[in-house]
Amino acid sequence: MLRIDNLDKRYKTGDLALKGVSLHIGAGDIVGLIGPSGAGKSTLIRCVNRLVPPTGGSIRLGDTELTRLGGADLRRARRRIGMIFQEFALIERLTVMENVLSGRLGYVGFWASWFRRFPQADVQRAFALLARVGLSDQVDKRADALSGGQRQRVGIARALAQDPELLLIDEPTASLDPKTSRQVMRLITELCAERRLAAIVNIHDVALAQMFLPRIVGLRAGEVVYDGPASGLTPDVLTSIYGEEDWSKTSDDVEIVDAAPRAADLSAPLKLDPALARL
């Protein structure tokens, strides 16, 4: 599905952000990316979607070599990659529905996107996604009126509206409280399982990574120093990733509460007001 081989990234300053990184991720696999600040986690994610050009190595999404693409070919490849950001990256003045539909911009023509006129099928899908993430009652609310957890759910729905094969998720809980963080992580893992989506989750919270992510990749100074199950994150392994620390307890025995009701299935027909198709 996603194959990264011997990936390097050296910035113009001479700093080597990634050194010989190799990862193979299958369909439906969700991988947690952990490591100290400056380890190269965000750089790796940005190399995959080509926001940052790698210096060397290979990144293949299916049969497509991403490192050689440019222009229209790169734009088409990016349709297959959904992004979920730490700071949500919503358009504040637009409604929840309009933000989710922005995930379809790569599939509609210029004028349709300019006037935000989306096909009815896209509107139906957006309604179903918002129901799935627990926001069916917030459709017409502006993004700047939402809580942090609600904003991240909009970001998740927008990424899924692209119908991606791969999700790149950069610090999805950094701006959230502990309870909301657990709810968001559970939602992400459930959605990936339902759709057999591959995902890379850059996450700073080791406890959350252990709770929700079956496979963990540890980066230190741009190199992979651990790639294995979450259960293998022993104190010695964590020390090799982060340095000396008291790792006697990295996760709490907590009850995970999922506030996102499992509502409309994407395949279920929805009755729409015709005016909604002209959003």
Swiss-Prot record:
Its main location: membrane. It holds the Pfam family ABC_tran. Residues 2-246 form the ABC transporter domain. GO terms for molecular function: ABC-type phosphonate transporter activity; ATP binding; ATP hydrolysis activity. Its EC number is 7.3.2.2. ATP binds at residues 35-42. Transmembrane segments: none annotated. GO terms for cellular component: plasma membrane. Disulfide bonds: none annotated. It catalyses: phosphonate(out) + ATP + H2O = phosphonate(in) + ADP + phosphate + H(+). It is a peripheral membrane protein. It is found in: Cell inner membrane. Keywords: ATP-binding, Cell inner membrane, Cell membrane, Membrane, Nucleotide-binding, Phosphonate transport, Translocase, Transport. The keyword Membrane applies. It comes from the Bacteria. The keyword Transferase does not apply. NCBIfam families: ABC_phnC. The complex is composed of two ATP-binding proteins (PhnC), two transmembrane proteins (PhnE) and a solute-binding protein (PhnD). Part of the ABC transporter complex PhnCDE involved in phosphonates import. Responsible for energy coupling to the transport system. Belongs to the ABC transporter superfamily. Phosphonates importer (TC 3.A.1.9.1) family. This is Phosphonates import ATP-binding protein PhnC 1. It comes from Rhodopseudomonas palustris (strain BisA53). The gene is phnC1.
